[in-house]
Amino acid sequence: MNLSAVIPTILGIPFDAQSSYLRGAAEAPTKIRQALACDASNHWTETGVDLGAAGIYEDGGDLEFLERDAFAAIENGADEIIRLGKRPVCLGGDHSITYPIVKAVARKYSGLTIFHFDAHPDLYDEFEGNRLSHACPFARIMEAGLAKRLVQVGIRTINRHQREQVQKFGVEVVEMSTLPAYDTLKAAGPIYITFDMDVLDPAFAPGISHREPGGMSVREAIAHLQAIEGEIVGADLVEFNPVRDVDGMTATVAAKILKEILGKMIAG
C-alpha cells in the first residue's frame, strides 16, 4: 500500500453532545486552526516536513449538521474525503466522533489497527444509559468488527467493567505506569490514530474536561507518535475543551500534536 499521493485532509467536527461531564469541545477545531496558523511558530514538523508547502495537505473546513443527524453526517463526511482519494484527519469534538469516522475508514481499509492514545479506555458498553457516549466508542467499534487490533496507550484510569471489556474484545492496553510502549506501535496493515488530549498530563494540557494527573508529557506523546511503523490511513484529535484552557496553552499543544500527526502521515 503506497499512500504517498493520498493527501491528508483536515475535517473539523464541532460536536460535543455526547460528553458526559462538560461541554465545550465543539469549539476546539477553530482554536486548533488558529494555533496552527499562529506566527509564533513555523510550519515545519520534527520529521522535516514543511506543512506550509503548497498542496501537502488540505483543510476541508468544518462539517455542518443538526445534532440529531451528527453520526450519519460525520460518517458521510469522512467517507467523502476517502472517496476523493484522500486521508481524513478529523478535529473534534468529543471522542464519540471516532466511531462514525472509523465506520467510514474501515469500509475502505480492511484489517485496521487502531492506535488509541488516552487516559481512559472508552470501552463502556453503555454509560449512564447511553451506548453512544464518548465513554463508549471503542465498544461499538470492536463489537462491529471494524478493527482487527486495538492498542490503547497511556491508560491510567480503568475500572472492573472496562477490564472485562478489554478481555472480551482482546484489546492491547499499555497503561501509563508501563511506558514507553514503542514496540507495540507497529502494524502490517492500515493504521488509524485517535489521540485524546487527556492522555497528556493536565500540567501540559489543562484545557480538557476530564483531567487525570500522571499522564504523558508532550515530548513522550510525540515520541510515541514518531515510533509508529506502518501506513496511517486516518486520524482524529479529540477532547480538547477550550472553555477550560489556560492562556491558549492546550490549543498550542493540540496544534503541535496535529502537526506531528500530519508530518508522520506525509513522511511515512
Where are these regions (language model features)?
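Conserved alpha-helical scaffold segments that buttress catalytic/binding sites
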Residues: N2-G268
